[in-house]
Design a protein with these regions (language model features):
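Active-site proximal loop and beta-alpha junction motif in alpha/beta enzyme cores
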Residues: 1-130, 137-184
Length: 184
């Protein structure tokens, strides 16, 4: 089916139960993407005096993805980052940006597949449990660094699969309610 969003109409396909991803799994065609220079930005790592190199990805909204590699082993694990404080990105992006921190957990060039762990600080609201466009931006950055097109990425809200081609990106995961609010 089709779903209208601020980023345009997205095509969703129900896949049912998918091993490793859960029940009520959907695949969303997230559309075209644009990537800037790999590692063209510097990103402060909140709660430390360190920084990492980040890659700009436009998914219809701006992202800078920082892959925390072995060179940053003395810095906190992705799970331990302090994302209460907003990361600073240089050069500055006028419209602000979401910032993703990612660790590559496993990669298999023979299978064209990899696994990673990610956390995201979204512009205007801080850390969130997940971010669909952020997951896609992360997979696009990982593809640029490794040549691998298919990524299973774990965020605090769950595990999703992202498949990248030169033309577009697809996001696959379960539809899960993570919270309810009541407006007074």
């Amino acid at each position: 089916f089709r779903l209208g969003t601020r980023a345009g109409v997205k095509v969703l396909t129900s896949l049912g139960d998918v091993s490793g991803l859960g029940k009520d799994v959907f695949q969303v065609e997230m559309g075209a993407w644009k990537r800037g220079d790999v590692d063209g930005y510097e990103v402060t790592i909140p709660g430390t005096s360190g920084s990492a190199r980040g890659t700009f990805v436009d998914m219809g909204n701006p992202h800078v993805v920082a892959v925390l590699e072995d060179a940053f082993a003395s810095l906190p694990n992705v799970e331990d980052l302090d994302l209460v404080t907003k990361p600073v990105v240089a050069p500055e992006i006028p419209s602000d940006q979401n910032v993703e921190f990612v660790r590559i957990d496993e990669q298999s060039e023979g299978d064209d597949a990899g696994e990673a762990t990610m956390r995201v600080n979204e512009r205007g609201c801080g850390e969130t449990l997940s971010c669909g466009t952020g997951l896609c931006a992360t997979a696009i950055t990982l593809r640029a660094k490794t040549g691998i097109d298919h990524w299973t990425i774990t965020v605090r809200g769950g595990t999703l699969r992202v498949d990248v081609t030169d033309e577009d990106v697809k996001l696959t995961g379960s539809a899960t309610i993570v919270g309810k609010i009541e407006l007074l």
